[in-house]
Amino acid sequence: MSDFVDRVTVHVKGGDGGNGSAGIRREKYKPLAGPNGGNGGKGGSVILKADQNATSLLDFRFMPHRTADSGTMGLGDTKDGSNGADLVLPVPVGTVVFEARGAQGFPKKPGAVLADLRHAGDTYVAAAGGAGGLGNAALANRTRRAPGFALLGEPGDERDIILELKSIADVALVGFPSAGKSSLIAAMSAAKPKIADYPFTTLVPNLGVVQAGDMRYTIADVPGLIPGASQGKGLGLTFLRHIERTEIIAHVIDCVTIDPDRDPLSDYYALEKELGEYADDLDLPLGAIPIPERPRVIILNKIDVPDAKELADFVRPEFEKLDLPVYEISTASHAGLKELNFALAKLVKEMRAQIAEREESVDEERVVIKPLEEPGTQRRNGRNAQVREFEIEREDDGHGNFWFTVTGVKPERWVRQTNFDNDEAVGYLADRLAKLGVEDSLRKHGAHAGDEVRIGRGERAVAFDWDPTIAAGAEMLDGTQLGSRGKDLRLEEEDGRKRRRTNSERRREYHEMMDARAAVRAAMQAERAAGHWADPSIDDDRHDEQSLFGRGEVEEYEDEPGADGSRQLD
């Protein structure tokens, strides 16, 4: 099995964020001294990093599932959980990251380009780690002094990606099988490719570093091409993509072929046809030179063989008519290699200067279009990118069942952070959604109490029956020590500063109290003057009888008054 692998499908998952803690600080004489739950740690991310020492994607074939570490849970005493370590995966320089498309259980196909790691040190976050949940200490405020809940950590990103290696070399050696490409790269560099006297000996690209004085450049030995390679014949498109990154294409032509249908000119035109057909379907990055317009070099090989020199001298004028530089070499005797080496180095130097100028001009000419701000959107992190808070869509299954789907960064994140086993946390979620305007928007879309509402899509969607009058937090709990959500009445009693009165308030309360007493005394004097009260100096129950007279509740009494002038009841 070859050690060279240039395309793999990898399943990456970021670490989950740690859950927040819902702790209460307990001290002597203060059994409930306030919340002290810490925040959960952030999950680690899966990061791809271009490394010059990496030459293949072989490691990903045997280990296609990569997961970063998760963050730990927060603790009491406001101790935050530790963050999960990032998982940094080295990939060869020239690796392109694609979005994997396809049904579950079937081979994935490349989709949109996510990243192009063309330079050493380039990084790409393939799967971001989840954020840690907030503890109840971070959730406390003036109105929610003792939250009885904490937020859950968010799960890390999870998806499939396709890694595709496109070799980055200054010069690409192309030619028919057994043209001597591997022998040439072995003669010009320290590379040691497999060399044999049969076709398709080279099955994987070989890279070699060539030194020409103080100039250093790289050459790539692309496996042999044949007519129809652009349609999949021979090795097909398997290695044609390695030519995309090379700025110079060198045709290595065999001058001693024994095939009667082949000659140096026909070999050149046949390979150019395949390169042109492959380039038609190629989507090059902005500013890149199309493959048909890149510089060509003709290398006539094996001139040390009898009659090969005569054939090379015969076809040389034909190539020169096409304005193509021609070099006659022998990889066996090393004839002409020095001249070829310095000629390629000079051409590479010129192309590098053109590439630098082209990249600068592309950056200067790039047009940035800034969209107008729309109602219901907001800026993220002060940048021009706008983010719509949420979207609501009414959906149905065609059988009379319908529901409302709420999508948006904030609502979906809040749902993932909510512990639905905690009623107070559910009430907190309801308040956040109402404050964001979700409830008002649901009413505008025709939602009624009891309708099904789904927040998010896919496996992480949460469905529930909408109740716009849902009680909040602590009000849903059966506890005599709980006030409004997030409050504990025992903590309210310990706050003496809240009952402290100002001097003006004290004077006002004193005057109100004295006025109330004076009013009571005046009322008592009026009742006594009206005869509703008996003489308090006599110890009997006549004041009770007199009070009954005042209310008109006596129906019968004696005609003759008593010795003290009072009436006696029957």
Curated annotation (Swiss-Prot):
List residues of the Obg domain: 2-168
Q: OBG-type G domain location, by residue?
A: 169-349
A Pfam family that this protein carries is GTP1_OBG
| Family matches, as PROSITE patterns | G_OBG, GTP1_OBG, OBG, OCT
- Ranges for region Disordered: 15-43, 521-570
GO cellular component entries: cytoplasm
Main subcellular location of this protein, as a coarse class = cytoplasm
- What is the annotated localization of this protein? Cytoplasm
- Residues engaged in binding Mg(2+): 182, 202
EC number(s) per entry: 3.6.5.-
Binding annotation for GTP? 175-182, 200-204, 221-224, 301-304, 330-332
> Which cofactors does it use?
Mg(2+)
Q: Which CDD domains match?
A: Obg (cd01898)
Chain ranges of the OCT domain: 382-468
State a single Gene Ontology molecular function.
GTPase activity
In terms of domain of life, where is this protein from? Answer: Bacteria
Record bears the keyword RNA-binding: no
Q: Name one GO biological process term.
A: ribosome biogenesis
This protein's UniProt keywords: Cytoplasm, GTP-binding, Hydrolase, Magnesium, Metal-binding, Nucleotide-binding
Q: Family assignment?
A: Belongs to the TRAFAC class OBG-HflX-like GTPase superfamily. OBG GTPase family.
Question: What role does this protein play?
Answer: An essential GTPase which binds GTP, GDP and possibly (p)ppGpp with moderate affinity, with high nucleotide exchange rates and a fairly low GTP hydrolysis rate. Plays a role in control of the cell cycle, stress response, ribosome biogenesis and in those bacteria that undergo differentiation, in morphogenesis control.
Q: Which HAMAP family does the UniProt entry name for this protein?
A: GTPase_Obg
Spell out the subunit comment: Monomer.
Protein's name according to its UniProt entry: GTPase Obg
